[in-house]
A protein has these predicted regions:
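Bilobed periplasmic-binding protein-like "clamshell/Venus-flytrap" ligand-binding domains
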Residues: 5-7, 53-88
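Extracytoplasmic/secreted proteins, especially bacterial periplasmic and envelope-associated proteins
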Residues: 15-19, 41-48, 57-68
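A broad, low-specificity signal for short, low-complexity segments enriched in glycine/proline
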Residues: 8-11, 39-40, 74, 98
Length: 113
């Protein structure tokens, strides 16, 4: 038997820290989200990763952290990621969706012919 629960999260900003720090950055963050994941080595690495300025090094470290959390420790099991579909009519010259996919009320990136 294994105790588990299901939750959802949508990215607030386009950065892996949005997920990793939010859920695994400190014992308090892990506990309040019912993850009860207390790998202090990972939490120290998350704190250090937040200060990495070089984008390539930073993304490499976040990928390694995700591998540790998901594959090695099995503390988090991503179940799905939403797909966002858009239809563009003949009168639209260009359309650039929001990076996170939601555009239901944002027409600032639309150019008409």
């Amino acid at each position: 038997d294994m105790v588990s629960f299901v939750s959802s999260w949508t990215a607030d900003y386009n950065d892996p820290d949005n997920f990793i720090y939010t859920f695994f950055g400190t014992p308090e963050k892990s506990n309040v989200r019912s993850l009860n994941y207390f790998n202090t080595d990972v939490m120290s690495r998350v704190a250090a990763a937040r200060g990495i300025v070089d984008d390539t090094k930073r993304l490499t470290e976040y990928a390694a952290l995700e591998k540790q959390i998901v594959e090695e420790d099995a503390a988090w099991v991503p179940m799905f990621s939403r797909s966002h579909l858009f239809v563009k009519g003949d009168r639209v010259a260009s359309f650039t969706p929001h990076w996170a996919g939601y555009n239901d009320t944002q027409y600032i990136n639309v150019t008409l012919k």
